Design a protein with these regions (language model features):
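Short coil/turn linker motifs that delimit alpha-helical repeat modules in TPR/alpha-solenoid proteins
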Residues: 13-14, 51-55, 92-94, 125-127, ...
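Alpha-helical repeat scaffolds
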Residues: 2-8, 35-47, 74-90, 111-126, ...
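"A position-specific structural signal for the A-helix of alpha-solenoid helical repeats
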Residues: 17-27, 31, 58-68, 96-106, ...
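Cytosolic, positively charged, low-complexity intrinsically disordered regions immediately flanking transmembrane
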Residues: 18, 91, 95-99, 111, ...
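Membrane-proximal, non-transmembrane interface segments of integral membrane proteins
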Residues: 1-69
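Non-cytosolic head/periplasmic domains of membrane-anchored proteins
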Residues: 44-100
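Long, non-transmembrane cytosolic or organellar matrix-exposed soluble domains/tails
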Residues: 116-178
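Short coil/turn linking the two alpha-helices of tandem helical-hairpin repeats
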Residues: 31-33, 53, 72-76, 108, ...
């Protein structure tokens, strides 16, 4: 859709839409679990081609997304780099604190293998966020040694879109448990 929109849009928006298209391809790759491809696609976009009024928000979101990708790739050097970038990124409508807390929780659970209750105490804002929160909540419960809660959370997302890596991992866990 973005590709069509970028080609058919008025000239001043065209470059912005093209860059968004590149970034969105990375987000789709992330959701499918292809983290290396996600990193490559998300890193290709040129912030200077984004319409000036959207740059701060785009930088904040892209840094957040790239940090999540690097956490799943277990790339300590890039994790440190994008954490620093996220801390320097300008806030956009008060969303920065939430994104920082979320990435810290993901890093604790996935990279550091430490318990972090963020996903148990925070409410998701939409269905995709609910799936993500259930996935990381299940990993957190697994770190706590709470097999029942882990199973329950994975079961709650196992019937969702099978293309999502959250769902694929939940199914692997449930199949391995039987």
């Amino acid at each position: 859709m973005f590709r069509v929109q970028s080609e058919k849009s008025i000239k001043i928006f065209r470059a912005t839409y093209r860059e968004y298209c590149q970034f969105i391809q990375g987000q789709v790759a992330y959701l499918k679990g292809d983290f290396q491809s996600a990193k490559e696609n998300m890193s290709k976009y040129d912030l200077k081609k984004i319409w000036k009024r959207f740059r701060n928000h785009t930088f904040l979101i892209s840094t957040y997304e790239l940090l999540k990708v690097c956490i799943h790739l277990q790339d300590a050097q890039d994790i440190a780099f994008f954490e620093e970038q996220l801390s320097k990124a300008p806030d956009f409508k008060g969303s920065k604190a939430k994104l920082v807390a979320q990435t810290q929780a993901i890093k604790d659970i996935v990279f550091n293998q430490e318990v972090n209750d963020y996903f148990d105490t925070t409410e998701p804002e939409n269905k995709l966020a609910r799936i993500m929160f259930s996935y990381y909540g299940a990993l957190n419960a697994q770190l706590k040694g709470d097999g029942g809660r882990t199973r329950s959370l994975f079961e709650s997302i196992a019937h969702e879109n099978p293309e999502l890596f959250y769902v694929q991992e939940a199914k692997k866990y449930l199949e391995g448990e039987n």
